[in-house]
Amino acid sequence: MLTDRQLLILQVIIDDFIRSGQPVGSRTLSKKHQIAFSSATIRNEMADLEELGYIEKTHISSGRVPSEKGYRYYVDHLLPPQRLTRADIQKIRSVFAERIYELEKLMQKSAQILSELTNYTSIALGPTFKESKLKQMQIVPLNEQTAVAIVVTDTGHVENRVVTIPSSMDAGDLEKMVNIFNERLNGVPLIDLKEKMETEVADVLRRHIRNYDSVLNTLIETLDAPEEEKVFFAGKANMLNQPEFSDIQKVRPLLDIIEQEKDIYRLLRKQTQKGVRVSIGHENELRGMENCSLITATYSVGDEPLGAIAILGPTRMEYSRVITVLNRVASDLSAALAKWYQSQ
């Protein structure tokens, strides 16, 4: 159990290190107005905090920096509350005040405002793709043998596949096929499309179009393929602006994680409980994120969490501001999604 004096010194050390990025020594602490102790007392308390594992020495300075244990205690018990400025609130409101017709644009804008307000890398995981509905289908001929099948969902998600056109099928057959698809499948949830295409739509096509099988099977594959929600990033390059990541060899594994996206997707998909979660350093299960903190928040419609937004940055992160921004964006995004779903 830390004493009140130790708690104060720990908080001031972490606040100062987050702000400056420089190790904090007893001389620096003695100049802080909230620290009214002698230099000897400060040194003794810092030695105790180091022995307890909350702060640690660096090789390049006599000062101390927070350890992962120190950051965890700070986030759980010492985090000072922070309010957003009017300008911040207005920026967030302006994003969600716009009328947005495609869900993917809404998610991308959410990622952008998070990155802009925090100067870290932001991530937004879209709502479950299988909950989307078919909005429109097109088949665009490329030549006599091939065409591109384009599928658009109500969220703005677009999938396309190259399909082989049977020699017995002409442009009129393709047009008729597209009309049947759009008439029978518009508004159908993607999760139900495969069954509907294999039964009801196939029966109609069988009566009107010869050799429809190969085109239909390719379209079924196109609609059945995307099982992972889309991940939206903003501010990827912000990582390189952090002093901790100035060594490109150290940051390369992290950049690989960001570029591959799948690992980040799986990480965010596990965030199903409402609220904010903070993972610090080695608490992150992905190799390459040992020097990072990942702060995630869920967004929802009603009581149902739909997805997550997150901020990825160094362990020397402005936790209070990031958590405040995430909470506000998650709240406004949830409200915007509720309106969007009601309008569909």
UniProtKB/Swiss-Prot annotation:
HAMAP family reported in the protein's UniProt record: HrcA
Naturally occurring in which organism (per UniProt): Geobacillus kaustophilus (strain HTA426)
Family recorded in the similarity comment: Belongs to the HrcA family.
InterPro entries: GAF-like_dom_sf, HrcA, HrcA_C, WH-like_DNA-bd_sf, WH_DNA-bd_sf, WHTH_transcript_rep_HrcA_IDD
Keywords, sorted A to Z: Repressor, Stress response, Transcription, Transcription regulation
Protein function: Negative regulator of class I heat shock genes (grpE-dnaK-dnaJ and groELS operons). Prevents heat-shock induction of these operons.
Source species taxonomy: Bacteria, Bacillati, Bacillota, Bacilli, Bacillales
Pfam families, A to Z: HrcA
Organism domain of life: Bacteria
GO terms assigned for molecular function: DNA binding
Biological processes annotated in GO: negative regulation of DNA-templated transcription
Protein encoded by which gene: hrcA
Name used for this protein in its record: Heat-inducible transcription repressor HrcA
